[in-house]
Amino acid sequence: GLFGTISYSSMDERFTASLGLRADANNYSSAMKSLSDQLSPRISLSYQLAEHWFVSGNAGLYYQLPPYTALGFKDNNGTYVNKYNLRYMKVSQESLGISWRKGDTFEVSVEGFYKDYDKIPLSVVDGIPLTCKGNDYGVIGNELLTSTAQGRSYGAEILVKWLIAKKLNLASSFTIFKSEYRNDKESEYIASAWDNRYIFNLRGTYNLPYQWSVGMKVSCIGGAPYTPYDEEKSSLVSAWDAQGKAYYDYSKYNKERLPAFAQVDLRIDKTFYLKHCMLGFYLDLQNITASKLKQQDVLMSTGIIENPEAPADSQHYKMKRLKQSSGTLLPTLGITFEY
């Protein structure tokens, strides 16, 4: 690969620009060996409109290899079955923002962004873009794939920073977005596994007298979409015995959504400045509200056949659901030492 960049700043430093160009290639297949097919230009601009006011924007084209598990997948004959199906994944992104700054003590900014994804690997078996397979799938990519899926994500972010020297350090951000994928150009967009819709973060530290300080972090994220199980198919004895786990109902892919999750962390520090060193003690309380992050229930077979008198291909297991959630108060006591 090759990479180059050039930067410019005006004499009064009100305008800055950066240009870059990257090219990638490899010898995995004939479709990936040409540098000219994976040229990635990018540009970043910033301009001071007036006192305290700044506008900035950037645009770029990026290429990335599919997962190595996909590139290295072989069939029973030892053939790299994805060799002629996969291409570099292509991502183009643009953003534009405006900010108001008062020195280094206060800043408010608003930024909008748009990302377009192309040549994303698609699972031939499941008919799902590889990037949409969430944490439930374990290792992904070791299957037959084709680079036909597309995606997009877009949204806006508000960022606030406030600093009072030796007293307060506060930062907050709120992002709203949508993340969608489709199998090909003719398909409709559907929510990706990461389409949480919003993320909120607030963190701050306040310095008290006598070298005490208190910090807090508040995090909140919208619920992720998920695909419900096909209970009828999953309960079939022949189907369950074939793979030992439930089947998803892909006709309702990512149509359901989990609850939102919020967490509050608290930290208290006490510092002692000695002659040649600094000694500190802290109490860190993560998730002080003991909030629970809920996941999709697991559909399991009880091993009991509900209709043993039925023909073998029509017998069904009695099923049960196991709740999945995590989250507990996690206290930590610590010591810091600097010499």
Regions found by a protein language model. Give the residues of each.
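C-terminal beta-signal and adjacent terminal beta-strands/loops
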Residues: 118, 170, 220-243, 259-263, ...
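Outer-membrane beta-barrel channels and translocator barrels
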Residues: 11-13, 48-52, 91, 101-105, ...
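Surface-exposed extracellular loop regions of Gram-negative outer-membrane beta-barrel proteins
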Residues: 52-94, 114-139, 143, 217-243, ...
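Structural signature of Gram-negative outer-membrane beta-barrels, strongest in the C-terminal barrel
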Residues: 1-118, 173, 199, 205
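Residues on the lipid-exposed face of transmembrane beta-strands in outer-membrane beta-barrel proteins
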Residues: 2-8, 43-47, 96-100, 156-162, ...
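Gram-negative outer-membrane beta-barrel transporters
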Residues: 9-11, 15-17, 114-116, 135-228
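Residues that define the transmembrane beta-barrel architecture of outer-membrane proteins
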Residues: 35-39, 90-94, 150-154, 196-200, ...
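Extracytoplasmic loops and strand-loop junctions of Gram-negative outer membrane beta-barrel proteins
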Residues: 23-28, 75-83, 91-92, 137-145, ...
